[in-house]
């Protein structure tokens, strides 16, 4: 993947890959799915951002993909953050 990014000249725009696997989910509750995969403890909130935007909670992954996919390579790039919550 890193070689492909360098060939396309996208190294500076996207940075280095994180090494996380890519899964395909068309209808899922993304934050709950990711909390399980990342082994986040109860009481920790997960926030997923796409293009510096927090998508609507009820929005399906297919809709998020169609709205925010990269026009160059067709991938959906996500950033996530966790925060401890009370309760």
Swiss-Prot record:
UniProt cross-references to Pfam families, sorted A to Z: ATG8
Post-translational modification: The C-terminal Gly is amidated with phosphatidylethanolamine by an activating system similar to that for ubiquitin.
Family stated for the protein in its record: Belongs to the ATG8 family.
The name this protein goes by in its record: Putative autophagy-related protein 8E
Quaternary structure note: Interacts with ATG4.
GO-annotated molecular function: phosphatidylethanolamine binding
Chain intervals for the UniProt region annotation (Disordered): 1-30
Disulphide linkage map: none
Keyword terms, alphabetized: Autophagy, Cytoplasm, Cytoplasmic vesicle, Cytoskeleton, Lipoprotein, Membrane, Microtubule, Protein transport, Transport, Ubl conjugation pathway, Vacuole
């Amino acid at each position: 993947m890193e070689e492909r990014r360098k060939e396309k000249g996208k190294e500076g725009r996207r940075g280095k890959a994180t090494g996380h696997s890519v899964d395909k989910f068309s209808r899922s509750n993304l934050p709950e799915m990711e909390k399980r995969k990342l082994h986040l403890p109860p009481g920790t909130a997960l926030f997923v951002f796409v293009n510096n935007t927090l998508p609507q909670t009820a929005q399906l992954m297919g809709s998020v993909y169609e709205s925010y996919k990269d026009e160059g390579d067709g991938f959906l790039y996500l950033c996530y953050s966790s925060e401890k919550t009370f309760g």
